[in-house]
Each structure stands twice: as structure tokens, then as C-alpha cells.
């Protein structure tokens, strides 16, 4: 379950930003998670709750905005939607796809005190 280590990394960022921006409590964390990022959302919610116990983010709400996967097809030159890595191009059937979106994991914004 790599989601736990992802949550630990998020907490580290929160702690660094709290020192830098002088806030003491995190109320909400909004993440953007790409459909191709390989993140299990239920595990992410669980891991976030566990990792944040007894920290500045204890009880914080995690909101996840999922971004669709996108790729550029080298076969037909089209930008296409993909749900999984290594899918074929839905337009021409080629497997020569270059992912151009939907593989990100980033903190979009925070609500803090």
C-alpha cells in the first residue's frame, strides 16, 4: 500500500508549509489525483486519517478531485482519453500513446487556521 507513504509525504509538506506560512491547523486538504497515477482512492482516504492523527492535520478533511487520463497518439496524431496505461488508442487502435495528463498527484489547496 504505497498510499500510506504518499500520505506521509503530504503530511511532511503540510508541516513545512505550516512553519513557512505560520498556520497551526489544517482543516481541509484538496488533492488532484490523475486517473493514471496508480492511486487507490479508498486507501488514500484511510492512510490520510491514520497518518494525520495527533498532528496539525488531525481531523482534517481530505477532498480528492480525480483528473482524467489523456494521451497523445503517435499513430494518428490525436489527443485521446485513456482510462489505463497501455490502453490502445480509441480512434486508431495504436498502442503508441504518450501520456500527457492524468498521472499527477498534487496538493491543489488547503484550508488552514
Swiss-Prot record:
Gene3D superfamilies the UniProt entry points to: 3.30.2320.80
Biological processes, Gene Ontology terms: protein maturation; protein modification process
Residues noted as binding Zn(2+) in the record, renumbered to the chain: 73, 76, 89, 92
Signal peptide start and end residues: none
Keywords: Metal-binding, Nickel, Zinc
Record GO terms (molecular function): nickel cation binding; zinc ion binding
InterPro entries membership: HypA/HybF
Domain of life according to the entry: Bacteria
A Pfam family: HypA
Sequence positions that bind Ni(2+): 2
Function: Involved in the maturation of [NiFe] hydrogenases. Required for nickel insertion into the metal center of the hydrogenase.
HAMAP family: HypA_HybF
Family under the similarity heading: Belongs to the HypA/HybF family.
Name this polypeptide is given: Hydrogenase maturation factor HypA
Native source species: Alkalilimnicola ehrlichii (strain ATCC BAA-1101 / DSM 17681 / MLHE-1)
Amino acid at each position: 500500500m504505497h498510499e500510506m507513504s504518499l500520505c506521509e509525504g503530504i503530511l511532511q509538506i503540510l508541516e513545512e508549509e505550516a512553519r513557512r506560512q505560520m498556520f497551526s491547523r489544517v482543516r481541509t486538504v484538496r488533492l488532484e489525483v490523475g486517473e493514471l497515477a496508480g492511486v487507490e482512492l479508498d486507501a488514500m482516504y484511510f492512510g490520510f486519517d491514520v497518518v494525520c492523527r495527533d498532528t496539525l492535520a488531525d481531523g482534517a478533511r481530505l477532498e480528492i478531485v480525480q483528473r482524467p487520463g489523456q494521451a497523445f497518439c503517435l499513430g494518428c496524431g490525436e489527443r485521446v482519453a485513456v482510462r489505463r496505461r497501455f490502453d490502445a488508442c480509441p480512434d486508431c487502435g495504436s498502442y503508441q500513446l504518450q501520456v500527457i495528463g492524468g498521472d499527477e498527484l498534487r496538493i491543489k489547496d488547503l484550508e488552514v487556521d
